[in-house]
Amino acid sequence: MKETINIKRKEFVVIEKMGERSFKVERKGKIFFLKKYDRRDELEEFIKNSRRLKITALETPKVYMFDKDQLISVVDFIEGDNVLDLLLKDNSLDELIYKSILADEWYMRREKLKIDFAPNNFKFNGKKLIYLPFKTLPFEQGYNFAMKEFRLWFYTKEFSKYVKSLGYSFDDSKIGNEYATNKQMALMAVKYYM
């Protein structure tokens, strides 16, 4: 018999345990991501951030429900690989991904919000880029996205260091000429950001 989790008289069937407190669940044929929190302030932070992100143009999974008594949130489950997995398979991402990430950064800067733009925090469903963590960070005046996080979206020294810190192996010989990479990044920024 499959494990079930009941929230506000709604029953969710556990399909897969994804982490210590995270589950892929199903209800009435729809797949969701369910997360249990240890502390009330963690859930409150999730609720606050989901509301802040909802008013931006940033794509996030739809929040289905949350329960403050059981310390649980339920959001739409986004299928597929995250952008880091796509990058590790192939150096060239769909141009729509670059267009989306630059637009997302512009919207966040305009709203005076900061998010973690690391590629493993995003999924691409073929049409749009979706931010998964529901986490915002303190806004930093003068923060340079292009010199920090955007470099993680290309085969650079920063990308190599980042993926190795996550426990992935990466062949440093795949890192291209830094001048050519910087030029590609600048052209993307001019095309989609300016």
Where are these regions (language model features)?
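Protein kinase catalytic-loop region centered on the HRD/HxD motif
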Residues: E105-K112
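Structural motif at the C-terminus of the N-lobe alphaC helix and the adjacent alphaC-beta4 loop
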Residues: N49-E59
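C-lobe/activation-segment region of protein kinase-like
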Residues: K112, N125-M194
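Active-site ExK catalytic segment of metal-dependent nucleases
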Residues: F33-R39, D76, P133-K135
